[in-house]
Amino acid sequence: MWKLKIAEGGPGLVSGNDFIGRQHWEFDPDAGTPQERAEVEKVREEFTKNRFQMKQSADLLMRMQLRKENPCQPIPPPVKVKETEVITEEAVITTLRRSLSFYSSIQAHDGHWPGESAGPLFFLQPFVMALYITGDLNTIFSPAHQKEIIRYLYNHQNEDGGWGFHIEGHSTMFGSALSYIALRILGEGLEDGEDGAMAKSRKWILDHGGLVAIPSWGKFWVTVLGLYEWSGCNPLPPEFWFLPDIFPIHPGKMLCYCRLVYMPMSYLYGKRFVGPITGLIQSLRQELYNEPYHQINWNKARSTVAKEDLYYPHPLIQDLLWGFLHHVAEPVLTRWPFSMLREKALKAAIGHVHYEDENSKYLCIGSVEKVLCLIACWAEDPNGEAYKLHLGRIPDNYWVAEDGLKIQSFGCQMWDAGFAIQAILSCNLNEEYWPTLRKAHEFVKASQVPENPSGDFKAMYRHINKGAWTFSMQDHGWQVSDCTAEGLKVAILFSQMPPDLVGEKIEKERLYDAVNVILSLQSSNGGFPAWEPQRAYGWLEKFNPTEFFEDTLIEREYVECTSPAVHGLALFRKFYPRHRGTEIDSSIYRGIQYIEDVQEPDGSWYGHWGICYTYGTWFAVGALAACGRNYKNCPALRKSCEFLLSKQLPNGGWGESYLSSQNKVWTNIEGNRANLVQTAWALLSLIDARQAEIDPTPIHRGVRVLINSQMEDGDFPQQEITGVFMRNCTLNYSSYRNIFPIWALGEYRRRVLFA
């Protein structure tokens, strides 16, 4: 059986806080009773049977394990409220106690709530490809690992034979080709899989243009693997690292995610690195093209992308740049004497890779970047220490559930914990659930980043992070404005509670450090970006090289980052009015102006990191309310309430499709189904805006949906994905289905029933 390990290290691993927050899965062939194994097989079979109706796992393996380790007291039966019934406090508090008992039972011993953070169908396959190249596939992925990877890929194959960009999406060349290749590497034959799954996949790929039609990121990976030629890729010259910092296209001005993808890519491109051409690679060259490999027009293939993958078509000016670099710059840079510059550029690029590796304890900013850095380190030195350290941190990236083994972005431990704490505190049941809160408080304190990046971090295009909270855990090291703000909020809230209940409060100097990080990130327009100060011009987005993302090249401001920053600073000002008071007042004022400025004409806010208008609106409304705005004195809040009420479904809930993010137009979930997480976001917005003082009926109707949806064990059902990034890719947060219904019910009890 698979076992989730919490806060445990491993050979050669380094941690700044004794691995608090670390979560990784190990396979133990002797673990589990026959009954437990049968239970696991049952939920696997049920997922596979229903995989086309419900594409997200319910994260049941983790829940089953932790509930056995942390048994809770018997809970009362679930409450059901009829349409004609008035919602009573007893109904709400019973539902809350059932929810909190369940959610406390799946808290890890280090204080965080483990949970899946996955969904994209391009995180996993590069790990399989990279380890195949390096020869360590069977060392890192045992037969049990490989079995679960194969299970996952087949479970998320679409009915037409292809795979999507993410698990809810239509089939794309990117997802299909990478998945087919990964399955072949893992030993699947040409006709293997249920109902000829491999043959169907191959047919889909060939019918849609073959491997030449894979997008640019895919072209890179299949080239490194040996299935494609570097002459069919747009250039990634490492010499860009030598441009003067003032140049608008310098990599240091890129969004950190884009920059950290470019670093190892430019190194591998500059070396023209290609893995071993094995018999399998030779076979795949025949399987995945509609013409003989040696007859392919690679220059034409550079700009060939399947229409199913094309979300962001390249503007003409970008294609002209690629053409110049390909036909003019590269032939010059690869010949003497300019080849000496290439060698220096390669050293600079790999130097940046090593800096990122060392400062993130070989986790890297995300799994996409990690596997690129891993293969770059191996290309530099197959026997080097850096590559070995990368291997040791691979388990931090994968997650096992009833649908199989998948790769996560990097984990959302701190992000989920910050929300979970606020949700529990909203219930006013602290004395009943103080052990849960105390453990969570210790996790928050242990997760704050204690020091800035090493050395001359500004020369490495890094920003201060001392005092920040990351999205995942301290070892990750990457500051995020909203995570820092949520961490600041819960640290302050805990500091106002009795220490004998929740433990010793955090030192005020550490709160000051967090404030320093937040204030340092604000842009001139008042908004807050996510990771680093905005450094580049907006027109640079014209050179976004990906075909499937939008807003990926430069850092920009987001309402979901601005709102927590404003909210956190407002709470800090309440208790520490003398610390940087003038600057904080100015920052809050400018942040509020930004939030009001980016409101949509219909009263909503577009959410970049969650789906979509319900998500953005919840953040914006919360910040405005925290600064004294309400329905009566703020036109923006009145418009937001009108917007949300216009989207309420006949059953009282809200349900918004991921297509809202992609198409930038509100789209209901298919069948006009309600989603409990989005229903909770809408309710929190209406409660914050004080809609209840005008007409509480819509709030009562939404709360009824939450109460009636609770399951027998106190959990809430898994529904559609509610996370998203870069407009076009979904991300499942399995803890959201617990956190936000609890939070909405807690606020409802406290601010509507008791009002």
Curated annotation (Swiss-Prot):
Question: What EC number(s) would the UniProt record show?
Answer: 5.4.99.41
Q: Which GO biological-process labels does this protein carry?
A: pentacyclic triterpenoid biosynthetic process
| Active site: residue positions | 482
Q: Name one GO cellular component term.
A: lipid droplet
* Superkingdom per UniProt: Eukaryota
Is Repeat given among the entry's keywords? yes
User: Which residues are in coiled coils?
Assistant: none
| PFTB repeat spans | 146-187, 511-552, 588-628, 637-678
Task: Spell out the reaction equation it catalyses.
Answer: (S)-2,3-epoxysqualene = lupeol
Give one Pfam family: SQHop_cyclase_C
Query: Which terms are listed as keywords in the entry?
Result: Isomerase, Repeat
Q: Which InterPro entries match?
A: SQ_cyclase_C (IPR032696), SQ_cyclase_N (IPR032697), Squalene_cyclase (IPR018333), Terpene_synthase_CS (IPR002365), Terpenoid_cyclase/PrenylTrfase (IPR008930)
Q: Which GO terms describe its molecular function?
A: lupeol synthase activity
Which PANTHER family does the entry link to?
A: TERPENE CYCLASE/MUTASE FAMILY MEMBER, TERPENE CYCLASE_MUTASE FAMILY MEMBER
> What does this chain do?
Oxidosqualene cyclase involved in the biosynthesis of lupeol.
Q: List the NCBIfam families hit by this protein, alphabetically.
A: squalene_cyclas (TIGR01787)
Its family remark reads: Belongs to the terpene cyclase/mutase family.
Q: What is this protein called?
A: Lupeol synthase
Q: Which gene encodes it?
A: OSCBPW
